[in-house]
Structure formats: structure tokens, C-alpha cells
Amino acid sequence: MVRENLKVLVEYHPFHESIKKKILEEEYNFLYNPLIDGYNSNIRAYRTLGDLNTKGIKLVKEWISTLIRQHYPGFDYNIGAWIAKYNKGDYTLEHDHIPSGFSYVYFVKTPKGSSPLVFSTSGKRIKAEEGKVIIFPACMRHHVPKNRCEGRVTIAGNIWIS
């Protein structure tokens, strides 16, 4: 079965600029290359650990909850979140998010040269655009090629089905 044929949802947040401002003003504890700190991550960029719940993150999670109820009704879920900040040369290794049900990426800040999200099997590239969220089945393998700019910021997370 070609998993890339599974439903991928792409939407834009109608109030992105106000959410972006909140998220970029909030303080986060970023680590670089978490392998050095004993934490295994596919992300080779600055990233946070754990499940974030700042005001800006909560606004994004609430919007994603609305999208899930509209497009994937009939199940209970829990949404996690972390932030990744990519500078020039940073990237994310190919991976999936099994055993969660779905995963997402929300593009907070995308300067010119921001890398796309690439689904590995199909090679489909989804352009990084501010305010865009991509919700996809967790089994879909994906990666982020080397970034060509400073300051690409994303919120990503898993959507756990209960």
C-alpha cells in the first residue's frame, strides 16, 4: 500500500499574524541537536522538548482541534506540541510518528529560503508558508531538507487517538 495516498489536510489559519506575534514573543527552552544532550530526535535544529501549552500554542491547538472535528469526526484525541527553529543548514531526518494517529506541522515563520515538508515515498513537497497547517496520518514518512535561511519556525506535534 502506498501510504502517501492517505488523506493529507492543508489549511490556513485566518488570524495567523496575531498568533505568530504571540508565539514569537513567548519564551521557550530550546536545545540544539538533542542527541548531544542524550535526547534522541530527528530534528537537527533548535527545538523544545515535551508538550508545550503556552498561550500561543494553545491557540494553535484549539484551531487544530476544530479542524479535526470537521474533517476526522468520531474519535477522541489528545494534541501534543513542540517548536522547532531552523537556521541555515538545519534539517530533519526522515521519520514517521507511529504509534500516534496523526501528526501536524504549523508554519509560524517562513523567511525566503524556508525548506518544505517532503513526504518521502511520493516525493511530494509542501511549501512552507506562514499560517499553513498540514495534518497527516502519522505513518507517512517525511523529512525537511537543509534549510537555506535563518529563522524558519514551526510548531509540530502528534495527535493521539483515544
Language model region names:
Residues 75-146, 150-162:
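Catalytic core of non-heme Fe(II) oxygenases with the double-stranded beta-helix
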Residues 1-74:
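Non-heme Fe(II)/2-oxoglutarate
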